[in-house]
Amino acid sequence: MPNEKGLSKREQLREKRQREQMRNRMVSIGVVVVGALILAFLFIYPNIKPVGPVTAITPGVYPQNEMNTMGDPNAPVKLETWEDFQCPACRNFSENIEPLLVENYVATGKVYYVFHQYPFIDDNSATKESDQAANASMCAGEQGRFWDYKSILFTNWNGENIGTFADRKLVAFAESLGLDMDKFNSCFDANTYKSQIDKDFMDGTSLGVSSTPSIFVDGVFVVNPDGPNLVPTYENIAAMIDAALAK
């Protein structure tokens, strides 16, 4: 029987079904739009929010530093590390163990020290803070300030993939160090060191690196005997170096 609009029951059902389909379509569109807005916010916001204060550092003294290396290339022992600038264990290594190694072995001509990039903490992040920080550090290295830039990165780090190493922040670190900003920005914007960083990563992976910091003495992985997941102590590394020097 037709209703007040003159529609049969079959036509009423068809109209109801069309309304439901339209409503479902609008809900789906709404979900997609909201999702896109959230993703856009997560990607864009870290690079538009205020940079905030930068904790300055006192420039260090690094014997025979050349880009991401330190010491005499002809030293009898080679020390290599693979690190991610968003890694808290790397920060601890850099601040508490590395200075002792530099003082006792690198500065004395016994060890040639090479830092390798191993950015992986940002693998599932759209902002790629580990990779961007790695490139920025190498751009600073062009001006002889790799190790100071490494220091300012760790000094200002306060969390993984939360905007600490957003592009604008990385530029602010370079400004704090007094770098030539035209040169730095040109290098940074071009992602100049991407291929070298990728090579570092692949080289580390081929050696068995899967976490950071990973430390090698003359190509031999340094292990903490207290546990395979523990970062080697200064004593662990020094013992390996001393053994290599004694050969």
Task: Label each PLM-derived region with a short phrase.
Residues 2-47, 98, 171-247:
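C-terminal cap of thioredoxin/glutaredoxin-like
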Residues 69, 123-127, 139, 187, ...:
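A generic helix-loop boundary/linker signal
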Residues 75, 80-175, 207-210, 236-242:
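Structural alpha/beta surface segment adjacent to cysteine/selenocysteine redox centers
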Residues 68-70, 104, 204-205:
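Short, flexible, glycine/charge-rich loop motifs used to bind or transfer phosphoryl groups or to couple energy/partner
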Residues 60-77:
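A short beta-strand-turn-helix
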Residues 64-65, 97-102, 202:
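Alpha-helical scaffolding within the catalytic cores
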